[in-house]
Amino acid sequence: MTAPTEAAAETADADGFTSLRIKNVVRETDDAISIVFDVPPHLAEHFSYRAGQYLALRIQVDGQEYRRCYSMSSSPVKHQDLRVTIKRDRDGVVSNWLNDHAGPGDRISVAAPEGRFVRSGKDRELVAFAGGSGITPVFSLIQTELAESAGRARLLYANREATSVIFREALDGLVDEHGDRFGLQHHLDVEQGVVTAEKIAAFIAEAGTDADCYVCGPGPFMDTVERALLDAGVPAEQVHLERFTVAPVPTPSSGAQVTETVTIELDRETVTVDYRAGHTLLQMARMAGLRAPSSCETGSCGTCIALVTEGEARLLNNDALDEDEVAEGLVVTCQAIPTSPTIRFVYE
């Protein structure tokens, strides 16, 4: 991890990152920690956030720079400090490094909060479905909902086993504090098998299909929950999804169209480079030496949006653009793979 100076913490750098000091590291489970950041008063507005949003962290491990996004588990109405919770990913360089090495006093480069996994229908009951570390943004949403409204919240929280439950004591505390305003149901795969569509349907039936539903967890879990909610009659606009990972870039088939060149326009500069198979448009912009805007790199925040003016691209994941915007040629470059012989896109 790099160690920026105190002066570097005063303002954001050219990429929008600010150095923050780690105030505390909390061991939540054997494979998950929470990092609490100390935000100086003069940066409080810059780091203001809504429940459900995330922080992008930039660190260096063994001389290589990495950017990763982690959801905040703190509540903006209950906590002054920012807290992100990070679970080990077996193959994750950053999550493992932070779990092993992050400590109080260390400094990490952090971008301002972003994310669209936020409360939208405050007149509706909040019903959440979390799997594993997917509890992180959901916990922020639930704490905030119970603190600033008189409404109810329900949570179905799935984990492999009891020892992997993050925030167990804190969740039990919310049940004790708010009584029947907060309904909590744990699901353990080792005892009950994986969560089924039938279980999801039964859970949502208690709240009704007018609920505002929030879903975060492993891909298969999220797919099951999303399908079950839609099948139960919950309107699609009331089903909110937050994906921590996206599908890997596929290997082109032998008969696939081969892209030869990529042309990027950014800040009145135009650069054309040879395309490298399997790379996103954002990666190509960086390889061309351009300081392309980015943050989450999962297709969620919209920071890296650009307009394709020539050629075509397909999106591996897209939670930032609607159908009309995609039809106009807009892409999230972190998830865009070119599909035409040449492609030209503009960062606006």
Model-derived features with residue positions:
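C-terminal accessory/binding modules appended to enzymatic or scaffolding proteins
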Residues: 258-297
